[in-house]
Regions:
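Membrane-proximal interfacial segments on either side of biological membranes
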Residues: 1-224, 233-297
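Active-site/pore-lining binding-face segments in mid-to-C-terminal subdomains
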Residues: 226-228
Length: 297
């Protein structure tokens, strides 16, 4: 059941219970099914007809996503603007959602804007776009006001690895595909997907690309099947985890491209084949330094 507690309500307009009424409503802070800073609405209601056909435009400002079950402890505020028509109890509306910024685990969104469609408690989001780590993320999804079940699908391109890792020595542009699902209980929220990148470098050591998958449930972020393609071999790990902000690293292997042989990085130090990684790294650094020293301003 939807419930709202509204403060500082201002209502003015023309009321005709035998004809058409025009109302303008403005409120202060509100709570209940949804929490926010204020609502402003214009409404035209035809009392002559059955089901009270209406034309409505409404703006809800400062809406807190967590109050709608959209994430845990997310307080970045959004604005919902919509207009529609139909029987007053069952309006169908079209509108937009905007947020200056949105911070969720592992992702920081800026200038969020997208389209919404509302029909009897069911809300769909489409063509949602935002800036994330120097790139662009697009999204679509659906949300039910009553059950708080939602599904979100994301695609990101051109995400700069230096920004989320806070590591200027690690650079590549990442492409991301992900999904977020919630059954109505925010503690059961699940996010998963895959990522890949083009060429980049770490501490002046170049690599051809990175691929992997991720899974996030509540405060545990897991990465699986992560592979870094380098000139001297494939660096691979089945899993590493970030739990409550702490990194837990799984076994890291080096795979020789020619033989397919794999071994731990520690074992590779004293062996031929994949073991040439150490000497190759040193040669790469030496070569890069020589090239840099030969450049003129």
């Amino acid at each position: 059941q939807r419930r709202y507690l509204v403060s500082r309500v201002s209502l003015n307009g023309h009321i005709d219970t035998r004809g058409v009424s025009d109302l303008h409503i403005k409120t202060g802070e509100f709570g209940g099914t949804m929490v926010g800073n204020g609502i402003e609405a214009d409404c035209e209601i035809d009392f002559k007809e059955k089901n009270l056909p209406s034309i409505v435009s409404v703006t809800a400002k400062g809406v807190i996503p967590s109050s709608m079950g959209l994430g845990d402890d997310i307080h970045d505020k959004m604005t919902l603007t919509a207009s529609g028509r139909g029987p007053l109890p069952h309006l169908i509306c079209e509108g937009t959602v905007t947020m200056p910024e949105l911070h969720v685990p592992a992702l920081d969104f800026y200038d969020v804007k997208g389209d919404i469609h509302y029909d009897d408690g069911a809300m769909t989001f489409s063509d949602v776009k935002a800036r994330v780590y120097g790139g662009i993320v697009t999204a679509r999804g659906d949300y039910n006001v009553d059950s708080r079940v939602y599904h979100i699908y994301l695609h990101g391109e051109g995400l700069d690895s230096r920004i989320p890792t806070k590591e200027p020595r690690f650079y590549c542009l990442v492409t991301l595909d992900g999904e977020i699902h919630c059954d109505g209980n925010v503690k059961d929220l699940v996010a998963f997907g895959s990522f890949s990148s083009g060429g980049g470098f770490y501490s002046l050591i170049p690599f051809r690309g990175i691929t992997g998958t991720f899974h996030n449930r509540y405060r545990a972020l897991d990465f699986y099947d992560v592979t870094i393609d380098t000139d001297f071999g494939l660096i691979h790990t089945d899993a590493f985890h970030i739990i409550d902000g702490k990194l837990h690293l799984g076994k890291i292997e080096l795979v020789d491209k020619e033989s397919g042989e794999s071994m731990s990085i520690t074992d590779a130090r004293d062996r031929k084949g994949p073991g040439r990684v150490i000497s190759q790294i040193r040669e790469d650094i030496k070569e890069i330094k020589e090239r840099v020293s030969g450049l003129t301003p």
